[in-house]
């Protein structure tokens, strides 16, 4: 049956070859069968600018380029790869999506988000997010030498890890009230997002109507894909390959 695939939170980087291998397997064996592929943020562990053309980054860009030649491929930036820009889109052939975006998925309106904006109890991250999403801040960051951007990215990741270790389970998750607010505002019955690394299908009720929130999984222990079929059925699928 015709279907569309959704992935997020691969956190690709050179020092995790297992994740890269799972992504390349996904491109070869799963993506070619889909109508379209949506990547909902944190595809890279860190992205410091489209001008950072390392051998590893070029390898991933070329793999996306091969995919996008034959399949519509959509890319939403996350909190780890928010500096991805139009040059990256031109090099890969992907179409960039704003966060949030409402798409028509087999004639059904579906809200797509990365998901970090839903975690409103994490006040420190929300303050950080408001800063880094300002165009002038991004322009300033991209004007810095690559060597300095690498150091800053490393510093930000270390700070993020330390911060996350101090948070409770509830604070690191989405806020139900914010989910309800956003879904009401966008007038949708289905929300798909990543970020929290807690793959699940949540049944909700909004304005008396049954709704669903699908959370995509991270790729630290294998591949994680949402398969959404033309008839409205869907499944979160995990897979592992022998390395």
Curated annotation (Swiss-Prot):
Matches recorded under InterPro entries? Calcineurin-like_PHP_ApaH (IPR004843), LpxH-like (IPR043461), Metallo-depent_PP-like (IPR029052), UDP-diacylglucosamine_Hdrlase (IPR010138)
Q: Which UniProt keywords apply?
A: Cell inner membrane, Cell membrane, Hydrolase, Lipid A biosynthesis, Lipid biosynthesis, Lipid metabolism, Manganese, Membrane, Metal-binding
Q: Which GO terms describe its biological process?
A: lipid A biosynthetic process
> Where, per UniProt, does this protein localize?
Cell inner membrane
Q: What is its EC number?
A: 3.6.1.54
Query: What GO molecular functions are on record for this protein?
Result: manganese ion binding; UDP-2,3-diacylglucosamine hydrolase activity
Cofactor or coenzyme needed = Mn(2+)
Q: Which reactions is this enzyme annotated as catalysing?
A: UDP-2-N,3-O-bis[(3R)-3-hydroxytetradecanoyl]-alpha-D-glucosamine + H2O = 2-N,3-O-bis[(3R)-3-hydroxytetradecanoyl]-alpha-D-glucosaminyl 1-phosphate + UMP + 2 H(+)
Cross-referenced SUPFAM superfamilies, in alphabetical order? Answer: Metallo-dependent phosphatases
- State where substrate binds: 79-80, 122, 160, 164, 195
- Cofactor comment in the record? Binds 2 Mn(2+) ions per subunit in a binuclear metal center.
Q: Which CDD domains match?
A: MPP_YbbF-LpxH (cd07398)
- The UniProt record gives the binding positions of Mn(2+) 2 as 42, 79, 114, 195
Q: Does the record bear Lipid metabolism in its keywords?
A: yes
Record pathway: Glycolipid biosynthesis; lipid IV(A) biosynthesis; lipid IV(A) from (3R)-3-hydroxytetradecanoyl-[acyl-carrier-protein] and UDP-N-acetyl-alpha-D-glucosamine: step 4/6
Listed binding positions for Mn(2+) 1 are: 9, 11, 42, 197
State the membrane topology: Peripheral membrane protein
The Gene Ontology CC terms held by the record are: cytoplasm; extrinsic component of plasma membrane
Q: Does the keyword Membrane apply?
A: yes
Q: Name one Pfam family in it.
A: Metallophos
Q: What does this protein do?
A: Hydrolyzes the pyrophosphate bond of UDP-2,3-diacylglucosamine to yield 2,3-diacylglucosamine 1-phosphate (lipid X) and UMP by catalyzing the attack of water at the alpha-P atom. Involved in the biosynthesis of lipid A, a phosphorylated glycolipid that anchors the lipopolysaccharide to the outer membrane of the cell.
Q: Please give the family membership noted in the entry.
A: Belongs to the LpxH family.
NCBIfam families, per database record? lipid_A_lpxH, PRK05340.1
Protein name per its UniProtKB record:
UDP-2,3-diacylglucosamine hydrolase
Task: Please name the source species.
Answer: Coxiella burnetii (strain RSA 493 / Nine Mile phase I)
Question: What does the record give as the organism's lineage?
Answer: Bacteria, Pseudomonadati, Pseudomonadota, Gammaproteobacteria, Legionellales
């Amino acid at each position: 049956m015709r279907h569309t695939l959704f992935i997020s939170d691969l956190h690709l980087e050179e020092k995790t070859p297992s994740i890269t291998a799972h992504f390349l397997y996904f491109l070869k064996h799963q993506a070619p069968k889909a109508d379209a592929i949506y990547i909902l943020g944190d595809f890279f562990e860190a992205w410091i600018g489209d001008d950072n053309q390392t051998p590893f980054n070029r390898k991933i860009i070329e793999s996306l380029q091969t995919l996008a030649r034959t399949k519509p491929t959509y890319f939403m930036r996350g909190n780890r790869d928010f500096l991805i820009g139009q040059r990256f889109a031109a090099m890969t052939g992907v179409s960039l999506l704003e966060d949030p975006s409402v798409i028509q998925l087999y004639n059904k309106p579906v809200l797509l988000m990365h998901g970090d904006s839903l975690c409103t109890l994490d006040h420190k991250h929300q303050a950080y997010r408001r800063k880094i999403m300002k165009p002038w801040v991004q322009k300033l960051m991209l004007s810095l030498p690559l060597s300095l951007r690498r150091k800053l990215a490393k510093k930000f990741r270390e700070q993020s890890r330390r911060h996350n270790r101090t948070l409770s389970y509830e604070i690191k998750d989405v806020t139900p009230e914010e989910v309800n607010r956003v879904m009401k505002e966008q007038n949708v019955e289905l929300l798909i997002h990543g970020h929290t690394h807690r793959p699940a299908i949540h049944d909700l009720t909004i304005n008396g109507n049954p709704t669903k929130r699908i959370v995509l999984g991270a790729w630290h222990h294998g591949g994680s894909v949402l398969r959404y079929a033309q008839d409205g059925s869907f499944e979160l699928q995990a897979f592992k390959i022998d390395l």
